[in-house]
């Protein structure tokens, strides 16, 4: 399909000085410059598009759609503005966005809608689209035939995103999830699923509905206290044995050491507190043995995951996971951004939290592969139940992308 000799709404090719923020805007600008409507529509159909929504109206009625249309100051005509993710401004408390597909936008028409949609207004990839009843426009037919891509890939902001330094390092700690979801790994000014989508994500996955609850979960993640303390107990004991005896730790010896430590701890002890000396009571033998059995089963799970990770190239031969703190720190890097998208956080708070996650990770691990292995093990202990299903396989695929693609932060940002 061609644009024809002088298509309305299209001007000269984008100026050479303009740098597209992401691969999406580059593809749109190139299609626009070629006069290729089909290619332009196809790009739009394969990404999520953002539009301004009323925060006040959503907070009052979150189960409804709240679109905001604008009026052109020059012509007085009303239109609906849509944006790709690279064109969004930094989050503000008074302006929020929702996100949806081009197909949904075609179906969302009603008689009160303006006759025109404008994509990325004021940019070299801007295009005005006629907006009418579903199925009546050429772009809506393309939207029916394509859908936003759900395949994982490495994406970055080339304009407006940090690529080096402490904040970039902290953002890269969340890169496994970003690659898995196809989101921009270095977008600190986060919009994510949109204001409504980020609120829904935090509510459904974390039970977070207020700023105080978001702060609580972020603090726990940054302190590496959100995951099971038993996981870290088992791994830290193996670290101690390896450090004391140099190198490989036999699994049988590790299991025996767990039993010895737990039994010694169960006998009771004298603890010095601010109120003086306190004696803790011994634990019942049945409780102690049950705890030993549980941790030893955990050791079996850990070693089986590690064996699979070695086979899949995540862990080098004779290497093991030193800690699962990466699971908390990687999520902290994302939680900071999710909170910003949901307007529970300010940009400064998100930046500070992301940088702190990166600093803590650099103290706990030696390299990106070490960090990745800790994150993957923590995720699998939390979700996977030794099925080696999507919870595991998705992270293996994301790890391989981050360890191989030229633009990967893990290949361009020193871990320490």
Q: Which residues does each predicted region cover?
A:
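Polar/charged low-complexity regulatory segments
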Residues: 2-39, 68, 72, 76, ...
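Extended, Lys/Arg-enriched charged tracts that mediate electrostatic binding to polyanionic substrates
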Residues: 41-44, 53-55, 81-82, 87-99
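Structured helix-beta-strand junction loops
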Residues: 46-47, 112
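Amphipathic, interaction-prone secondary-structure segments
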Residues: 49-84
């Amino acid at each position: 399909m061609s644009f024809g000799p002088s298509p309305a709404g299209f001007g000269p090719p984008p100026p050479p000085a303009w740098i597209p923020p992401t691969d999406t805007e580059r593809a749109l600008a190139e299609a626009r410059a070629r006069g290729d409507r089909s290619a332009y529509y196809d790009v739009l159909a394969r990404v999520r598009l953002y539009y301004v929504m009323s925060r006040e109206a959503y907070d009052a009625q979150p189960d409804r759609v709240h679109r905001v249309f604008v009026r052109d100051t020059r012509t007085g005509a009303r239109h609906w503005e849509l944006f790709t993710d690279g064109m969004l401004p930094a989050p503000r408390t008074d302006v929020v966005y929702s996100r949806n597909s081009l197909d949904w936008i075609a179906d969302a028409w009603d008689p009160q809608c303006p006759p025109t949609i404008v994509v990325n207004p004021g940019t070299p990839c801007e295009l005005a689209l006629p907006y009418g009843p579903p199925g009546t426009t050429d772009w809506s037919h393309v939207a029916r035939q394509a859908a936003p891509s759900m395949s994982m890939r490495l994406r970055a902001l080339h304009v407006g995103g940090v690529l080096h330094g402490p904040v970039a390092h902290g953002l890269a700690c969340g890169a496994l999830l970003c690659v898995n979801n196809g989101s921009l790994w270095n977008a600190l000014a986060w919009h994510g699923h949109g204001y409504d989508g980020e609120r829904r994500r935090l509510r459904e996955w974390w039970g977070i509905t207020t700023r105080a609850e978001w702060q609580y979960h972020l603090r726990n993640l940054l302190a590496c206290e959100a995951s099971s303390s038993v996981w870290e107990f088992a791994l830290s004991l193996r670290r101690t044995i390896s450090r004391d005896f140099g190198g490989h730790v036999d699994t049988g010896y590790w299991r025996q050491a767990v039993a010895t430590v737990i039994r010694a701890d169960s006998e009771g002890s004298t603890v010095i507190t601010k109120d003086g000396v306190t004696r803790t009571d011994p634990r019942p033998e049945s409780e102690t043995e049950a705890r030993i059995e549980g941790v030893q089963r955990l050791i079996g799970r850990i070693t089986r995951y590690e064996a699979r990770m070695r086979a899949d190239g995540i862990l080098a031969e004779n290497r093991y996971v030193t800690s699962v703190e990466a699971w908390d720190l990687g999520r902290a890097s994302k939680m900071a951004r999710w909170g910003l998208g949901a307007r529970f956080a300010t940009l400064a708070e998100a930046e500070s939290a992301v940088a702190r996650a990166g600093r803590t990770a650099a103290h706990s691990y030696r390299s990106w592969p070490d960090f990745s292995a800790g994150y993957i093990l923590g995720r699998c202990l939390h979700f996977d139940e030794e099925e080696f299903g999507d919870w595991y396989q998705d992270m293996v695929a994301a790890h391989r992308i981050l360890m191989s693609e030229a633009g990967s932060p893990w290949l361009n940002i020193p871990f320490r």
